Swiss-Prot record:
Keywords: Deafness, Endoplasmic reticulum, Glycoprotein, Membrane, Non-syndromic deafness, Repeat, TPR repeat, Transferase, Transmembrane, Transmembrane helix
Family: Belongs to the TMTC family.
Subcellular location: Membrane; Endoplasmic reticulum
Known pathway: Protein modification; protein glycosylation
Keyword Transit peptide: no
Stretches assigned to the Cytoplasmic side: 1-14, 133-141, 187-198, 246-268, 376-382, 434-440
Membrane-topology annotation of the record: Multi-pass membrane protein
Name the UniProt record assigns to this protein: Protein O-mannosyl-transferase TMTC4
Native source organism of the sequence: Homo sapiens
Keyword hit for rRNA processing: no
Gene Ontology BP terms: endoplasmic reticulum unfolded protein response; outer hair cell apoptotic process; positive regulation of endoplasmic reticulum calcium ion concentration; protein O-linked mannosylation; sensory perception of sound
InterPro entries, per database record: O-mannosyl-transferase_TMTC, TMTC_DUF1736, TPR-like_helical_dom_sf, TPR_rpt
């Protein structure tokens, strides 16, 4: 087994704490770093993965989670992102149930506690990485390298690059994946207890358990499968003591003893490698079958380098992305929620100064790899090898080497690779301490890094508390990112600041002239401001760029309807439905078009389709009731109204519409009850009081009619119909008073 190099651990500028206290300190520090995010909102991707994800609600059968992607879409759909994380979604569903709805505090607290727990687990992981494996006679693993493991765990706990995973609720996928990844690694270590008397049987159990935990990690996030590769590296280079330098020397000298290398004759190692390979192959096969229609389809704006025609351009830019990821680990002050859409322009020429970053990255990596594989110091080899293994292997799924990914740089994918970074940094501090007498200076540097990173975590957690702060924080990092401007515009539009939203949407379109979502949203705002001509031009361009953009087709239809271009509007609605068959809002708007054209049957059919697809679509129900009421079909209007209220019992607008129908049918008592219920739900609706007054007027309850006419006119003094009815009532009351005299 690997043994501890006591010299390295003793000279590190770190305290020695018993395991319990070390874990308590690390866990507490991890909580302090990200506690500020506990009461934050759902931000950015949280909206799609949580708030709009029906898989979290009880109406969706639990079994559907195994057939849906992370965002709630069916995996078999061509539009699915194929991100299969059912166990993560299950935890969201439990959170939703325990919180009694979409209350973000519970979701954020779980994320913070998960990061704290993972940081605590890191103390054990780093103890193995730095100190090796040693067990007591009772089979308990010794806590070796206490200084190194504490320092590395603290560096991990306070790393600001983790903010996206902890403060963004969807980052739970990375947290859960990391948790089971580390448990799998520690479980694999259990297979090599020196006190193991049962030999292969016990070892096989722990190897199989490790593979199972790797599968669980993969069901939290795809990255989890890479733990099998890390376990294999650990087994070969640490347990098997495979020495590349020794092998190379024997090959060069044609040493016949090469044939007798223990690793090559180790049946146990070959058996474990077979298990790991078989387990990994099985997991990949199942994962591929689940994907259904093949890999996801990404666009050029998601990952521009992967669409470059030249293989050289692709390779250069991929390596530049790697250097940016390395820089985020080294200097995590430059953070952004999204790095796509022009944030990182492509390197297209060797004269681009950014190629220096590639050279620096590979200079460092090659140096570390040479030291890791060829150093005569076995302890140094082990630490560097495992540090590089943790740095590189979990990052492979995001590297674009095996398949195209849907992002340029993503801070969340660095959660596990940062373990390797912390190993290398801690080893570097140890090496510096060993070769210099300025121990206090190194200790001050270490404390400075911990303090600055903690401060950055607190500040960055604050930026993740709301979308406005998060999006605006990105402007200084990625001013060329069209998506940053788009998201700021969307946030402003949601708050009603249309003028500012238009400015940001226009900038997003300027930065990316093919940004159809920005065109669609800008077109919608212009439509609401009655700037119909420009709205039509933008929406027409959007559907020209992306012909299957159903939402843009529907919005184009709305604009064309407003311009009285009814045939074009109908065609646009039909095209939208063609590309998105289950589109209740489009059926609703199509029904409005038919109503404007007095095609009443077609309108009713369109609205009925909307309610079939979305039973809670109150606008469609309301329009059906009103149309049937206006055309004199009171019995049918009443039936539709009752059907609607059974599905949406607390919708006051439906109560109001049905109450009007019942009043015309002289069902005064039932109509009154519905009016009063609607008014209780929405007491400031002038029309509710006005129509209830009309009911009382017809019914002969003139004092009550007078009361509600007056309330209605207080709420809306400009309502001409109410004024006229109130005047009629007053004249009637005056006549009655004169007759009484």
């Amino acid at each position: 087994m690997a043994v501890l190099d006591t010299d390295l651990d003793h000279i590190l500028p770190s305290s020695v704490l018993p395991p319990f206290w070390a874990k308590l300190v690390v866990g507490s520090v991890a909580i302090v770093c990200f506690a500020r995010s506990y009461d934050g909102d759902f931000v950015f991707d949280d909206s799609e993965a949580i708030v709009n994800n029906k898989d979290l609600q009880a109406e969706t059968p639990l079994g559907d989670l195994w057939h849906h992607d992370f965002w709630g879409s069916r995996l078999s759909s061509n539009t699915s992102h194929k991100s299969y994380r059912p166990l993560t979604v299950l935890t969201f569903r439990i959170n939703y149930y325990l919180s009694g709805g979409f209350h973000p505090v519970g979701f954020h607290v779980v994320n913070i506690l998960l990061h704290s727990g993972i940081s605590v687990l890191m103390v054990d992981v780093f103890s193995v990485l730095f100190g090796g494996l040693q067990y007591t006679s009772k089979g308990r693993r010794l806590h070796l390298a206490p200084r190194a493991s504490l320092l590395a765990a603290l560096l991990f706990a306070v790393h600001p690059v983790h903010t996206e995973c902890v403060a963004g609720v969807v980052g739970r996928a990375d947290l859960l994946c990391a948790l089971f990844f580390l448990l799998s690694f520690l479980g694999y270590c259990k297979a090599f207890r020196e006190s193991n008397k049962e030999g292969a049987h016990s070892s096989t159990f722990w190897v199989l358990l490790s593979i199972f935990l790797g599968a669980v990690a993969m069901l939290c996030k795809e990255q989890g499968i890479t733990v099998l590769g890390l376990n294999a590296v650990f087994d070969i280079l640490v347990i098997g003591k495979f020495n590349v330098l020794e092998i190379v020397q024997k090959v060069l000298h044609k040493d016949k003893s090469l044939e007798n290398l223990g690793m090559l004759r180790n049946g146990g190692l070959l058996f474990r490698m077979t298990l790991l390979t078989s387990g990994g192959a099985g997991m990949l096969y199942v994962r591929w079958r689940i994907m259904g229609t093949g890999p996801p389809a990404f666009t050029e704006v998601d990952n521009p380098a992967s669409f470059a025609d030249s293989m050289l351009v692709r390779a250069v830019n991929y390596n530049y992305y790697y250097s940016l990821n390395a820089w985020l680990l080294l200097c995590p002050w430059w953070l952004c929620f999204d790095w796509s859409m022009g944030c990182i322009p492509l390197i297209k020429s060797i004269s681009d100064w950014r190629v220096i970053a590639l050279a620096a990255l590979w200079f460092c990596l090659i140096g570390l790899i040479c030291q890791a594989l060829c150093s005569e110091d076995g302890h140094k080899r082990r630490i560097l090898t495992l540090g590089l293994g943790f740095l590189v292997i979990p990052f492979l799924p995001a590297s674009n080497l095996f398949f195209r990914v849907g992002f340029v740089v993503a801070e969340r994918v660095l959660y596990l690779p940062s373990v390797g970074y912390c190993v290398l940094l801690t080893f570097g501090f140890g090496a510096l301490s060993k070769h210099t007498k300025k121990k206090k200076l190194i200790a001050a540097v270490v404390l400075g890094i911990l303090f600055i990173n903690t401060l950055r975590c607190v500040l960055r957690s604050g930026e993740w508390r709301s979308e406005e702060q998060l999006f605006r924080s990105a402007l200084s990092v990625c001013p060329l990112n069209a998506k940053v401007h788009y998201n700021i515009g969307k946030n402003l539009a949601d708050k009603g600041n249309q003028t500012a939203a238009i400015r940001y949407y226009r900038e997003a379109v300027r930065l990316n002239p093919k940004y159809v979502h920005a065109m669609n949203n800008l077109g919608n705002i212009l439509k609401e401001r009655n700037e119909l001509q420009e709205a039509e031009e933008l929406l027409s361009l959007a559907v020209q760029i992306q012909p299957d953009f159903a939402a843009a087709w529907m919005n184009l239809g709305i604009v064309q309807n407003s311009l009285k271009r009814f045939e074009a509007a109908e065609q646009s609605y039909r095209t939208a439905i063609k590309h998105r068959r289950k589109y209740p809002d489009c059926y609703y708007n199509l029904g409005r078009l038919y109503a404007d054209l007095n095609r009443h049957v077609d309108a009713l059919n369109a609205w009925r389709n909307a309610t079939v697809l979305k039973p809670e679509h109150s606008l469609a129900w309301n329009n059906m009731i009103i149309l049937l009421d206006n055309t004199g079909n009171l019995a049918q209007a009443e039936a539709v109204g009752r059907e609607a209220l059974e599905l949406i019992p607390n919708d006051h607008s439906l109560m109001f519409s049905l109450a009007n129908v019942l009043g015309k049918s002289q069902k005064y008592k039932e109509s009154e009850a519905l009016f009063l219920k609607a008014i209780k739900a929405n007491p400031n609706a002038a029309s509710y009081h006005g129509n209830l007054a009309v009911l009382y007027h017809r019914w002969g309850h003139l004092d009550l009619a007078k009361k509600h006419y007056e309330i209605s006119l207080q709420l809306d003094p400009t309502a001409s119909g109410t004024k006229e009815n109130y005047g009629l009532l007053r004249r009637k009351l005056e006549l009655m008073q004169k007759k009484a005299v």
